[in-house]
């Protein structure tokens, strides 16, 4: 018996040490929802942010939803109050490759969990048109909160099985040393974005980057259905929903169109109105307004907010500022079911004129 106990100790102790190391290193931060460590590995923000809001139900009543691009809508340009005078506290639920279908699931989970929401902004783009819900436990960055709900034990075990990323340990200790002076962590918990997403500078002009790849739009992602479901849910819950499209850099925009992006925009207009910032304008033809081939800079996001939330003079100035000699659809034009055919035809004409130059 004594030998058996000794053997078990030799087995159990190393396993416990290894499990403890996995929990400590925790590259994707699923064990550190209340104390994220901002390393060079992308955390599982879908899970972290959803759990954070459920643990702090009264802290935020207004959310931004979408892919990583929506991180570049600055907090200072958002409405401070509802139409009837209630204060709005905004949190950005942005995460890499966030899809409309996942966003709907997130909102439903939050409402069911007792989070009171008054306003939502959802940004749709060329990722939305093909990206559906991430299923299963195979991708630690993208595993959803809903997968966790199905089986918390399986969820956490899937992360314990991952080999610890030892190279980030110095970064973790650096984070701990910052303590209360960690501005990145404060920003994450107050608005859900990275420090880079507050940089209001315009970049350097240069050559047009190679396009960001997109996949073909065939309706399989369920994006349009999810947008419709979200719209109906918001009506039921008396939540103001604002749908907005991303301004997409010219090279990436052309590839998106070749994969059916304009069809997606038309289909989306059949289920909800939205502000259109995709198209040819001052920003989408200027690489200096983008961090890369995918992400517009916050300075563009602020102009978008002026169009959506500014008074008439501010809005008109922002629209005029974005206009160039190829623009046929104004920056932030409100697309509806009734005008969608004309808008899509103008977008097609824009891109055809651009290609002839």
Whereabouts are the PLM-identified features?
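Hydrophobic membrane-insertion alpha-helices, especially the h-region
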Residues: 6-26
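Secreted/periplasmic serine-hydrolase-like ester/acetyl group-modifying domain
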Residues: 123-124, 133-237, 321-357
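Short extracytoplasmic
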Residues: 41-66
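C-terminal regions of proteins
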Residues: 257-357
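Alpha-helical transmembrane signal-anchor/signal-peptide segments
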Residues: 25-48
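N-terminal post-signal-peptidase region of extra-cytosolic proteins
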Residues: 43-50, 100-108, 225
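Flexible, glycine-rich surface segments
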Residues: 201-286
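Membrane-embedded segments
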Residues: 69-155
């Amino acid at each position: 018996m004594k030998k058996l106990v000794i053997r078990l100790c030799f087995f159990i102790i190393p396993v416990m040490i290894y499990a403890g190391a996995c929990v400590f290193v925790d590259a994707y931060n699923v064990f550190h929802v209340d104390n994220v460590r901002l390393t060079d590995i992308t955390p599982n923000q879908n899970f972290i942010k959803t759990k954070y809001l459920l643990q702090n139900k009264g802290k935020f009543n207004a959310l931004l939803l979408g892919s990583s691009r929506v991180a570049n809508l600055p907090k200072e340009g958002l409405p401070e109050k509802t139409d009837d005078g209630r204060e709005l506290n905004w949190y950005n639920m942005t995460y890499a490759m966030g899809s409309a279908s996942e966003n709907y699931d997130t909102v439903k989970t939050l409402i069911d969990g007792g989070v009171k929401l008054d306003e939502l902004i959802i940004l749709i783009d060329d990722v939305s048109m093909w990206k559906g819900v991430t299923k299963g436990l195979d991708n630690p960055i993208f595993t959803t909160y809903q997968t966790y709900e199905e089986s918390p034990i399986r969820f956490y075990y899937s992360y314990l099985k991952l080999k610890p990323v030892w190279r980030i340990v110095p970064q973790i200790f650096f984070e701990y040393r910052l303590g209360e002076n960690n501005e990145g962590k404060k920003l994450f918990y107050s608005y859900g974005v990275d420090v880079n997403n507050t940089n209001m500078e315009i970049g350097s002009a240069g050559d047009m980057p190679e396009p960001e790849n997109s996949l073909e739009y065939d309706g399989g992602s369920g994006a349009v259905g999810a947008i419709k479901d979200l719209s109906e849910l918001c009506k039921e819950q008396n939540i103001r929903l604002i749908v907005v499209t991303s301004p997409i850099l010219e090279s990436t925009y052309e590839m998106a169109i070749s994969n059916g992006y304009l069809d997606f925009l038309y289909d989306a207009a059949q289920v909800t109105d939205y502000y259109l910032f995709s198209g040819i304008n001052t920003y989408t033809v200027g690489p200096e307004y983008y961090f890369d081939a995918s992400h517009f800079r916050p300075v563009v996001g602020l102009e978008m907010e002026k169009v959506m939330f500014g008074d008439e003079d501010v809005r008109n100035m922002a629209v005029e500022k974005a206009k160039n000699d190829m623009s046929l659809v104004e920056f932030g034009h409100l697309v509806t079911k009734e005008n969608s055919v004309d808008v899509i035809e103008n977008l097609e004409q824009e891109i055809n004129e651009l290609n002839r130059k």
